Amino acid sequence: MAKLAVNVDHVATLRQARGAAYPEPAAAALAAEAAGADAIVVHLREDRRHINERDVRVIKEVIRTRLILEMAATPKMLGIALSLKPHTVTLVPEKREEITTEGGLDLINHHSSIKQTVEALKNAGIMVSIFIDPDLDQIKMAHRIDADMIEIHTGAFCDAVNEHQRQREFTRIVDAAKIGTRLKLSVNAGHGICYNTIKAFQGLDEIDEFSIGHSIVARAVLTGMDRAVRDMLALIRAL
């Protein structure tokens, strides 16, 4: 059965909306963990627009599950990751003007520098995932640079505006998951997945873990984190 990694970035977004000291992302992480989350995800962006280094350190200290740190593949962020030592680092592209991560890493054109980051993280005992579009050549490159896993970018599928586009994008995800599995990569999926779109993944056993944040935090505002996480877990268990 696929696992659930809960991203608590948008708890920090709510905090930053008022420049307040609350809500505390670590408290949300503990609540998600208590509800059954298999891992906690945070994206430490270079502009620190939501999660900051203190958040990451506190979350790592208090949770018992895995901490997954999303970050750009830059020397400065590498140094921070080596200091924080999360269980896993997911390397993601980053643009300051974007609202959220807009696409996967381009390994074809940047494999040399990203490979150096992968090697440094793995030498420190940190698992490495690559956030990647469902493109077969990109996935093959992730294998060549010795990543442990990939996270398939599901945004194009989740944001599809018609059935034709939805089917086309989901076929790309299926093909990507299967080639990743054949290459002995662990295969995760994330970005834009909500309580409706998760249902499409029924029968796609190649997905090891779903990384979901915004939809869970949005529901948690109305129902509480415990209920929001348990509702998503129930849908994943039914896949």
Swiss-Prot record:
An example of a Gene Ontology cellular component annotation for this protein is: cytosol
* Compartments reported by the entry: Cytoplasm
Active site per UniProt: H43 (proton acceptor), E70 (proton acceptor), H191 (proton donor)
Pathway(s) per entry: Cofactor biosynthesis; pyridoxine 5'-phosphate biosynthesis; pyridoxine 5'-phosphate from D-erythrose 4-phosphate: step 5/5
Q: What is its EC number?
A: 2.6.99.2
Q: Which residues form a coiled coil?
A: none
Which keywords fit this entry according to its UniProt record? Cytoplasm, Pyridoxine biosynthesis, Transferase
Q: Which reaction does it catalyse?
A: 3-amino-2-oxopropyl phosphate + 1-deoxy-D-xylulose 5-phosphate = pyridoxine 5'-phosphate + phosphate + 2 H2O + H(+)
The UniProt annotation places 1-deoxy-D-xylulose 5-phosphate binding at D9, H10, R45, H50, T100
Q: Which residues bind 3-amino-2-oxopropyl phosphate?
A: N7, R18, G192, G213, H214
Q: For site (Transition state stabilizer), what residue positions does UniProt give? A: E151
- GO MF annotation list: pyridoxine 5'-phosphate synthase activity
Q: Which BP terms from GO are recorded? A: pyridoxine biosynthetic process
Q: Which Gene3D superfamilies match?
A: Aldolase class I
**Disulfide bonds, paired cysteine numbers:** none
What family does the entry list? Belongs to the PNP synthase family.
- Assembly and partners? Homooctamer; tetramer of dimers.
What's its job?
Catalyzes the complicated ring closure reaction between the two acyclic compounds 1-deoxy-D-xylulose-5-phosphate (DXP) and 3-amino-2-oxopropyl phosphate (1-amino-acetone-3-phosphate or AAP) to form pyridoxine 5'-phosphate (PNP) and inorganic phosphate.
Question: What is the protein name stated in its UniProt record?
Answer: Pyridoxine 5'-phosphate synthase
**Species assigned in the record:** Desulforapulum autotrophicum (strain ATCC 43914 / DSM 3382 / VKM B-1955 / HRM2)
